[in-house]
Amino acid sequence: MTAPPVDWVEAAEAADPASLADQAAVAALLGREPQGDFEVVVRRTGGAPVVIENAPVLPGGRPMPTRWWLVDAELCRRVGTLEAEGGVRRAEAEVGEAVMADAHRRYEMLRDRAMPQ
């Protein structure tokens, strides 16, 4: 069974620090206030946040462990279903160890580049 499509989402051309409306929307989607600063990097066509990019360090100086978060409720449900059905294992098997290792290295590079000096 295929899930119905969601309205198209688009990447933000240039992410800006979250507006007050973005902060309120993300807090509602998470069910709590975000721990640190973030930018909305993907939005639904109507402007609602879909993916946020977290600042690499939380206000208290602790590193933020997750750089990007999917916050859209419908897409989170769909991803959760895929994960519960073994989708992560299938995807990892399809792309192979070398591609996964390269993806992890690129993530580390982007994370490290964003860290304050």
Where are these regions (language model features)?
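Short N-terminal edge-element motif at the start of the domain
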Residues: M1-N54
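Intrinsically disordered regions, especially transient/low-confidence alpha-helical propensity segments
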Residues: P5, P65-T66, H104
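A generic structural signal for short, non-catalytic loop/turn and secondary-structure boundary residues
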Residues: R44-T45, P63-P65
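Short, glycine-/Ser/Thr-/acidic-enriched flexible segments
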Residues: V57
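Cysteine-rich micro-motifs
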Residues: P65-E74
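An exposed acidic His-Trp-rich patch
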Residues: A73-Q117
